[in-house]
UniProtKB/Swiss-Prot annotation:
<keyword id="KW-0547">Nucleotide-binding</keyword>
<comment type="function">
    <text>Is required not only for elongation of protein synthesis but also for the initiation of all mRNA translation through initiator tRNA(fMet) aminoacylation.</text>
</comment>
<dbReference type="GO" id="GO:0005524">
    <property type="term" value="F:ATP binding"/>
</dbReference>
<feature type="short sequence motif" description="'HIGH' region">
    <location>
        <begin position="20"/>
        <end position="30"/>
    </location>
</feature>
<dbReference type="Pfam" id="PF09334">
    <property type="entry name" value="tRNA-synt_1g"/>
</dbReference>
<dbReference type="InterPro" id="IPR029038">
    <property type="entry name" value="MetRS_Zn"/>
</dbReference>
<feature type="binding site">
    <location>
        <position position="167"/>
    </location>
    <ligand>
        <name>Zn(2+)</name>
    </ligand>
</feature>
<comment type="subunit">
    <text>Homodimer.</text>
</comment>
<feature type="short sequence motif" description="'KMSKS' region">
    <location>
        <begin position="334"/>
        <end position="338"/>
    </location>
</feature>
<dbReference type="GO" id="GO:0004825">
    <property type="term" value="F:methionine-tRNA ligase activity"/>
</dbReference>
<feature type="binding site">
    <location>
        <position position="151"/>
    </location>
    <ligand>
        <name>Zn(2+)</name>
    </ligand>
</feature>
<dbReference type="InterPro" id="IPR014758">
    <property type="entry name" value="Met-tRNA_synth"/>
</dbReference>
<feature type="binding site">
    <location>
        <position position="154"/>
    </location>
    <ligand>
        <name>Zn(2+)</name>
    </ligand>
</feature>
<dbReference type="GO" id="GO:0000049">
    <property type="term" value="F:tRNA binding"/>
</dbReference>
<dbReference type="Pfam" id="PF19303">
    <property type="entry name" value="Anticodon_3"/>
</dbReference>
<keyword id="KW-0030">Aminoacyl-tRNA synthetase</keyword>
<dbReference type="GO" id="GO:0006431">
    <property type="term" value="P:methionyl-tRNA aminoacylation"/>
</dbReference>
Length: 715
């Protein structure tokens, strides 16, 4: 990933995050923005930089109005529910903003009026009669999500303001083809009405220059925006027919478009912080302070084109950098709430007792920030057990435990040149990676230092040395404790809550969150009392991960059943949904419809394979001998099946929701016998019982229609 470095290391820095929309719960896709931003802000503070970290809830727009209407509450009440939810969730994850407001705060209403009025005064906003979708049955105009139709660019189903299912392009009012009212489902028509436009086209040259020379951040965002500018910019309708929102100056019947007042929230939240801290918001938005926006890749257009043009036109400072993350997949599937491929931060993670730092670590260390991140419960388990437990946790605990049991305090000693050199090397690499927004590189460098610590400890064998030379052993322990101190400071931005425990365990009474990186090289004070250490990380066991996978599978099955019942059965999303446009279009050509008299289910045709590939599968007929529920699971059954071997095979199958044990015992079933063994909820499965699944509503075990000997092969 290419990046553009910040120009100055002395200016104050404002770090912001794309605003969470106050219309639903926090999911792991949200955290791809907020956790890296928090890590970045913490790291800058550790370098001694002046950092302000702000965010807030995005509270306007049609989705909130629609959802509130469906729930029978006001938009304000809906916003209050989800604003509180996000605020509490962020704090649980160790994400602490200097200000966390809402775009419905008075500060944002006032600042939006100021900026829009300024744009009007300077001639950048003008009225225009346009075609607006109107529903005759509902007797109302239909802004944004109140209307759906065909995208004029790609033909996919789109909302009134965005083709979110297809090409992703922003749509202006009147562009949607074959409009349909989402309130009553009836056809909409276009009627003329006066609205107001921002002269975005006048900023084309400025934006190209700004994107080419001045804007820093990740080049995935910059190059994407430059491509849009090269295609030519059209003026932008900035008003909507809604009551909920920030009123357009002089027009009580219109509000500004949500993508006008939402980013202005960054300024309003900075104002709120400044009022509380007795500081100046102007040093960022009217001065030369740095402004770094962390966003999801899907809102690049707004932050790299609309937003800087508005700021430039109104005489405000423009962003210094835009850092755009890659997308998120769940278990190698395209993220989709409606299809069940989602991980909710609260009910799926925190409520099950998983430590917030484990998820922070996963998000930071899995891949480069701009690349696609796949969340998998098994990969989470592997990374935590192999890295945090076996490397970092192992070194910190064995060092502190040995020191506490044998000395009770920091022994006399000096930092060896080799130790200092390794710490300095890690610091240089971590700082450089953070400046490049390469959080995985930073974590890898920090973990390499922990690995060095384990090697140092093991090679010096302090458990032997203490019996021979207590002072020499003290020197080894002193250096291990110094490494532990350095690791606590370096890892603090990534796993702050756990490193606070380690810091206190080393006898420090100061605040690790306020400590600077440079303290990693400050020698420990001999005689400092050590606290009794606690294990910082524990292994994630198979049973626990199996339980989470079961919950995830049940959610997907429920989503499939719901969609099949409502829509006659859409296909389960294939892995091709995570492909680029060209690959996805090719994959879609391989889809066929299988119709029955009662329903229609879409089936994805997989690539053709050679017979040799099929021949590798050892598929046999087996007689079910015993079936019993798996403890701690509502879905799994332990099954013993005779497949023609000396002893019965033990299988674990997710069939408890579809069959009672009595319905399976004595039946002949089809078994994949040479599948690699796997543990599910602590029970080993040595094969797989094959079944048909229509998308979750029905699961049927495959059974021969004639009596046949156990062990008979499927050919």
């Amino acid at each position: 990933m290419e990046i553009r470095m910040s120009k100055s290391s002395s200016k104050p820095v404002l770090v912001t995050c794309g605003l969470p929309y106050a219309n639903g719960k926090a999911h792991i896709g949200h955290l791809r923005t907020y956790v890296p931003a928090d890590i970045y802000a913490r790291s800058l503070k550790k370098e001694g930089r002046e950092v302000t970290f702000v965010c807030g809830s995005d509270t306007h727009g049609t989705p909130i109005v629609v959802n509130a209407e469906e729930l029978g509450i006001t938009p304000t009440e809906l916003v209050e529910i989800y604003h509180k939810h996000f605020d509490e969730t962020f704090k649980q994850l160790g994400i602490y903003f200097d200000a966390f407001g809402t775009t419905d705060d008075p500060e944002n209403h006032n600042r939006t009026h100021d900026i829009v009025s300024r744009l009007i005064e300077k001639g950048y906003v003008y009225p225009k009669i346009i075609e607006i979708a109107y529903c005759p049955a509902c007797n109302r105009f239909l802004p944004d999500r109140y209307v759906e139709g065909a995208c004029p660019h790609c033909g996919e189903t789109a909302r009134g303001d965005e083709c979110d299912q297809g090409c992703g392009k922003h749509l202006e009012p009147g562009e949607l083809q074959n409009p349909v009212c989402t309130i009553c489902g009836g056809p909409a028509e276009y009627r003329q009405q006066e609205h107001f436009f921002f002269k975005l086209s006048e900023f084309s040259n400025y934006l190209m220059d700004y994107l080419s020379k001045d804007l820093g951040g990740t080049t995935n965002a910059i190059n994407y925006a430059r491509g849009w500018v090269k295609q030519g910019l059209t003026d932008w309708c900035i008003t909507r027919n809604l009551e909920w929102g920030v009123k357009f100056p002089g027009h009580e019947d219109l509000v500004v478009y949500v993508w006008v007042d939402a980013p202005i929230g960054y300024i309003a939240f900075t104002e709120e912080w400044a009022a509380q801290a007795g500081d100046s918001w102007e040093k960022f938005w009217k001065g030369d302070g740095e402004i770094v926006h962390f966003i999801g890749g899907d809102i690049t257009y707004h932050h790299c084109i609309f937003w800087p043009a508005m700021l430039k036109g109104a005489d405000y400072s423009v962003p210094t950098a835009v850092v755009a993350s890659g997308m998120v997949k769940i278990e190698d599937r395209k993220f989709s709430k409606t299809r069940g491929y989602v991980v909710w931060v609260g009910e799926d993670y925190l409520d099950h007792g998983f430590h917030p730092d484990l998820l922070r670590y996963y998000l930071a260390s899995y891949t480069s920030h701009t690349k696609e991140l796949n969340f998998s419960w098994r990969v989470l388990q592997e990374k935590i057990n192999a890295e945090l437990v076996a490397v970092l946790g192992n070194f910190l605990y064995r060092t502190m435990l040995f020191a506490f049991k044998n000395y009770g305090e920091v022994p006399e000693g000096e930092v060896e040149p080799e130790i200092r050199k390794e710490i300095e090397k890690a610091l240089v690499e971590v700082k450089a990676a953070m400046e490049e927004y390469e959080f995985k590189k930073a974590v890898d460098s920090a973990m390499a230092l922990a690995s060095f610590g384990n090697t140092y400890f093991q090679s010096h064998e302090p458990w032997k040395l203490i019996k021979e030379d207590r002072d020499a052993c003290g020197q080894v322990v002193y250096n291990c404790l110094h490494l532990a101190k350095a690791l606590s400071l370096i890892f603090e931005p990534v796993i702050p809550q756990t490193m606070e425990k380690a810091w206190k365990g080393l006898g420090h009474e100061s605040d690790i969150h306020a400590a600077l990186y440079e303290e990693t090289l400050v020698p420990l004070k001999a005689g400092t009392k050590l606290a009794k250490p606690e294990i910082l990380f524990t292994k994630l066991e198979d049973d626990r991960i199996g339980e989470m996978e079961e919950i995830a599978n049940q959610r997907v099955a429920a989503a499939n059943a719901k969609r099949n019942g409502v829509k006659g059965g859409e296909k389960e999303p294939s892995k091709s949904e995570g492909m680029g446009p060209s690959e996805a279009s090719k994959a879609s050509e391989k889809t066929v419809d299988v119709a029955t008299a009662e329903e229609k289910v879409q089936v994805e045709t997989l690539p053709v394979i050679d017979y040799e590939d099929f021949a590798k599968l050892d598929i046999r007929v087996g007689k079910v001998l015993l079936v019993e529920p798996v403890k701690k699971s509502k879905k799994l059954l332990r099954i013993e099946v005779d497949i023609g071997e000396e002893k019965p095979r033990q299988l674990v199958a997710g069939m408890a929701s579809y069959y009672t044990p009595e319905e399976l015992v004595g039946k002949s079933v089809i078994v994949l016998a040479n599948l690699k063994p796997a543990k599910l909820c602590g029970v080993e499965s040595n094969g797989m019982m094959l079944a048909a699944d229509d998308g979750g509503a029905i699961v049927a075990a495959l059974m021969p229609d004639k009596e046949i000997k156990s062990g008979s092969r499927i050919r």
